[in-house]
Amino acid sequence: MTLTPEDRTIILDSIRDIPDFPKPGIVFKDITTLLNNPKALSTLMDHLTERYLGYDLDYIAGIDARGFIFGSILADRLGVGFVPVRKKGKLPYTTVAEKYSLEYGFDEVEIHIDAFGENGCCSTGERSKVLLIDDLIATGGTAKAAANLIDKVGAHCVEACFIMELGFLNSKEGFSAPVYSVLEID
């Protein structure tokens, strides 16, 4: 399903801009106003549901923390499992981690080693098909690390989906999976 101009406006207008947050010169895109707007949230989720119905997915993986919101709603609508991609040290079972670069240092994300089935395979024995989702892609470091994690445990990241993309940062470059962004922000 292609997002209509009207639907795009409904979603975009529900996202609040917070100037100079978290530091001067940054305009933060606040999705809490999208989440508490039933029409905008439903419009967004209807679009994503229609887009991914034919993908024959096994799981949705949501990036900590806002990816959990959109990912769990979409997983429920598609009748597939949901897997949280967490910051290091937040999961209780055996995990696999992936390091990524920050402006000044490194961070890590992790998933349970059996998050997508034994050796990343679903009940048919084939590699689990996973959609990665988050609210925003800026530089892409966290998302690329999450996509690498999915592949590292033997599953297949079929696409990475973002509600918003800061297009001027060229974040899709070097991504191991196709990338879809609902809204491209310049």
Curated annotation (Swiss-Prot):
GO molecular function, one term: AMP binding
Cellular localisation: Cytoplasm
Record GO biological process: adenine salvage; AMP salvage; purine ribonucleoside salvage
Gene3D superfamilies for the chain: 3.40.50.2020
Family according to the record: Belongs to the purine/pyrimidine phosphoribosyltransferase family.
Assembly and oligomerization: Homodimer.
Designated name of the protein: Adenine phosphoribosyltransferase
GO cellular component annotations of the record: cytoplasm
PROSITE patterns linked: PUR_PYR_PR_TRANSFER
Pathway entry: Purine metabolism; AMP biosynthesis via salvage pathway; AMP from adenine: step 1/1
Main location: cytoplasm
NCBIfam families reported in the protein's UniProt record: apt, PRK02304.1-3, PRK02304.1-5
S-S bridge residues: none
Pfam (any one): Pribosyltran
InterPro entries per the UniProt record, alphabetical: Ade_phspho_trans, PRibTrfase_dom, PRTase-like, UPRTase/APRTase
Entry function: Catalyzes a salvage reaction resulting in the formation of AMP, that is energically less costly than de novo synthesis.
Catalytic activity entry: AMP + diphosphate = 5-phospho-alpha-D-ribose 1-diphosphate + adenine
Swiss-Prot/TrEMBL keywords: Cytoplasm, Glycosyltransferase, Purine salvage, Transferase
Top-rank EC class of the record's enzyme: transferase
EC number: 2.4.2.7
